[in-house]
Amino acid sequence: MYLKSLTLKGFKSFAAPTTLRFEPGITAVVGPNGSGKSNVVDALAWVMGEQGAKTLRGGKMEDVIFAGTSSRAPLGRAEVTVSIDNSDNALPIEYTEVSITRRMFRDGASEYEINGSSCRLMDVQELLSDSGIGREMHVIVGQGKLEEILQSRPEDRRAFIEEAAGVLKHRKRKEKALRKLDTMAANLARLTDLTTELRRQLKPLGRQAEAAQRAAAIQADLRDARLRLAADDLVSRRAEREAVFQAEAAMRREHDEAAARLAVASEELAAHESAVAELSTRAESIQHTWFGLSALAERVDATVRIASERAHHLDIEPVAVSDTDPRKPEELEAEAQQVAVAEQQLLAELDAARARLDAARAELADRERRAAEADRAHLAAVREEADRREGLARLAGQVETMRARVESIDESVARLSERIEDAAMRAQQTRAEFETVQGRIGELDQGEVGLDEHHERTVAALRLADERVAELQSAERAAERQVASLRARIDALAVGLQRKDGAAWLAHNRSGAGLFGSIAQLVKVRSGYEAALAAALGPAADALAVDGLTAAGSAVSALKQADGGRAVLVLSDWPAPQAPQSASGEMLPSGAQWALDLVESPPQLVGAMIAMLSGVAVVNDLTEAMGLVEIRPELRAVTVDGDLVGAGWVSGGSDRKLSTLEVTSEIDKARSELAAAEALAAQLNAALAGALTEQSARQDAAEQALAALNESDTAISAMYEQLGRLGQEARAAEEEWNRLLQQRTEQEAVRTQTLDDVIQLETQLRKAQETQRVQVAQPIDRQAISAAADRARGVEVEARLAVRTAEERANAVRGRADSLRRAAAAEREARVRAQQARAARLHAAAVAAAVADCGRLLAGRLHRAVDGASQLRDASAAQRQQRLAAMAAVRDEVNTLSARVGELTDSLHRDELANAQAALRIEQLEQMVLEQFGMAPADLITEYGPHVALPPTELEMAEFEQARERGEQVIAPAPMPFDRVTQERRAKRAERALAELGRVNPLALEEFAALEERYNFLSTQLEDVKAARKDLLGVVADVDARILQVFNDAFVDVEREFRGVFTALFPGGEGRLRLTEPDDMLTTGIEVEARPPGKKITRLSLLSGGEKALTAVAMLVAIFRARPSPFYIMDEVEAALDDVNLRRLLSLFEQLREQSQIIIITHQKPTMEVADALYGVTMQNDGITAVISQRMRGQQVDQLVTNSS
């Protein structure tokens, strides 16, 4: 097993991904100080799980991420991957190559991977621990590690040996077992307490379970009796309903016959009504026709009058067409023709002028040609003087060139000036807009502050509203739970009041027959003394108040006759004694009270209360009660817990049933608490509604504030964008202004220089002309030719002016002819429209006259039609009156039949109601059976109907089985036929038996079974926990023994190797390792004793720096040789050694190379010489580490490092 490669990405100074590939043997990493060599060691420690930032030479773990340089930005994460060759299966994983990756981000998040799969730090540490690489990282010896080893405590030195020997995993196992033991101790104590408590609860719950089992048997008997009675009721009610149904059917037949006769009469009445309606409709139609014809005749008469008047008006002659233009179209066209002729003449003149212009241009060209020929002749004549005047011509040319250049520069300067003014104006405008927008941004920023504060206030208010709503909701839920709990308690207590004894029977069946109600409801007891008064009253606490002895006798007789059970009755007319104890002022000992003083009763029960409670005192406890009775035997003393003491007897104990008096008091107390709880719930509900409204308002306000803030942010962002654009435009304009200004300055400087050159050249030219001696005579004919050319130029200019004048006159006349032609066409169209309008008016007059004639004919016909419609209307009215008389007779018959059908309908409804009531009673009975017994009606009648005989009871069958087992000749009990009276008595007996049992816990059986099961389960768990504790103690003992054995063997081997290594490093010296507490091998530390040759040193602090380093190296090498690891990493461990000691150490490294891989950071040349491969680490000015490598064996160079930017 050895390290194959190390890949660093963003780790410390390794900004670019860098991969170092290792091989077995010694690998030396060299380079100047500060180049990042030690970062390789830190990366190996970090990827193998190092958690100490100081160990990695940093202040915090995030310092391992590349922090950036002046030329490179910082990175967001650091990642290191180490690949390990596992072909020898040294690591407990089924891979021949294992890669471990650690990754850290700026936010502190860290990730680990093994072969690309995510894992935990513990997984990495456990994977490496089996190969001797533990959390202490003894295989990595960093800078300062040697001094730390010698200055550390003896117990810390022990950790190095334990880690190399693999003891740490045993210690982890022991620590885990001890933690389990601590947890198990708490669980053991809890289980013991639980089993003790369950064992205490089992006995009373077992008694309740027996009572519940007895009650279940009685309830089964009661259920059977009630089911049979319910089935009998259901059969009886169904028979009654069938009889009602038959009567209803007969009544329905009679009703249907009367309804049929009524239907015939109704149809006849409907026929008459239809005929009357038809006649009415026809009469109405005739009436409408008459009205329509009369109105139409009126409209026709009006139309005739209007048409006559229209024909009269249209005969008038229309007005003239138009007076806008007095000229006729022919005159306008003639004028247009004249203008066109003039235009043609002007065009002919224009052509002539153009021809003269062409001739003048030809003449000018000829004259200029002759002038040019004369010039050339003149030049030929003076060519002989050219050489002498060459300098003069050159100067003249230069002057002209310079003058042209000056003119060009002037034009350029003028253009630049215009552009400079434009740029300055644009810059000024842009800057003004920039300042305006900047001012608006300032205003928005001020508003933004207010919006932020407003938003924060609304959010804070919303948070308070949310908290208030949550608080009120929690309080409301608590109040609702309390209300539900109190209602359930009241219902449960009310069930206790529903007694099944004689008092309940009397209250249900003879209410009002001299009965006032129960004593518990009529009497009010002071709170806290209900149990005492219930014990003092005894059976009377559950009694009924009756109106005297007569009512009491009647009630008892009724109970006997109905077999309704027994009841206690209190007489309301019992005379009160003159002076009861409470009123006579008779004193009681301190803490005792008269029972009568604790009771408030109605006037009619005062005598009975005095009779029952006279001589009864209420005390706090049983001791006071016994003392009071011993002093005053004539009294009875009752405690607040319900223990009663009299002369010679005591009644008390536990498991007492609540009396009706106590139950009523508890109900009253619960009702008062319920009223308070409901009031509180209502208050909370109202407060919650208000809080929700407030919350909604606050939510809306917060959303509005947020929207306003977002809108403001959007506006500010847009303003900032506009501000940036304006700033750029202003800067561009200013830069252009500066650039143009600079160009103009440069051009002006060039112009100045050029003018100076022109002046200089002109001076030279003037001097040359003054010294000119040869004058070239100009021929006379050349002057004539030039004059002729000038005259030709004047003629060409005059011809060009004539052409321009002719063109303007032609353009002026060209549009006038078109305008006149359009005017003539418009006048002609107007005259046509006038003729058309006159023809239309004549046609309209003829049409109006024709309409008037036709209207007169139509009016005569309409008047005759109106007379005919009037006659038809009168005849239709007479027919309608005849139909109405016949319809009245039929309606009387319909009314008579309707009354009979109504009576039959009422009778039928009564029968239907009776049938529905019978069905409702049946449905209610079926619903009651379904709800109480969970049986369908059909199953009820099938299994428990009157036709089903009663099977023998369980007791009869048990007696039969017993007799048969005894060998007696017995006959099996036969089923008994159904008898309602017998079943009613059977149900009452079962009810009395349940009443005698008292309050029964119906869940006792299930609770007892569950509790017993839980007790057995917990008992088993308790034994399992004890056994597991014993096993864990055994595991701890085994681990301790294993630690002792492994550590002892490792220490012996390391101590032996230390002697040899120390002697090799210090020839003639002596060194050994010593246990600080040999008697306690589990906690003993290790001391190092070193005596270099020729020195008597007892303390390590007296050694020199090199001797300390060699001693620490000796201890590490001893550990390495005693318990070899696959690889070791050392960072400048030989820096303090001289050449002799260094070579001794290197000889040890060469021995270690045979078994392990060594990676060493060094500056020493001897160390480099023994290395199998060298890695050179450099750092340029960019602050980023780069690595190069060279394999030393065989002087062959391989590229083992990959750098990528």
From Swiss-Prot:
It holds the Pfam family SMC_hinge. It is found in: Cytoplasm. InterPro entries: P-loop_NTPase, RecF/RecN/SMC_N, SMC, SMC_hinge, SMC_hinge_sf, SMC_prok. Residues 514-628 form the SMC hinge domain. ATP binds at P32, N33, G34, S35, G36, K37, S38, N39. GO terms for cellular component: chromosome; cytosol; peptidoglycan-based cell wall; plasma membrane. SUPFAM superfamilies: P-loop containing nucleoside triphosphate hydrolases (SSF52540), Smc hinge domain (SSF75553). GO terms for molecular function: ATP binding; ATP hydrolysis activity; DNA binding. Residues 169-288, 330-499, 661-771, 802-836, 979-1033 form a coiled coil. Keywords: ATP-binding, Coiled coil, Cytoplasm, DNA-binding, Nucleotide-binding. It comes from the Bacteria. GO terms for biological process: chromosome condensation; chromosome segregation; DNA replication; sister chromatid cohesion. Required for chromosome condensation and partitioning. Contains large globular domains required for ATP hydrolysis at each terminus and a third globular domain forming a flexible SMC hinge near the middle of the molecule. These domains are separated by coiled-coil structures. Homodimer. Belongs to the SMC family. HAMAP family: Smc_prok. This is Chromosome partition protein Smc. It comes from Mycobacterium tuberculosis (strain ATCC 25618 / H37Rv).
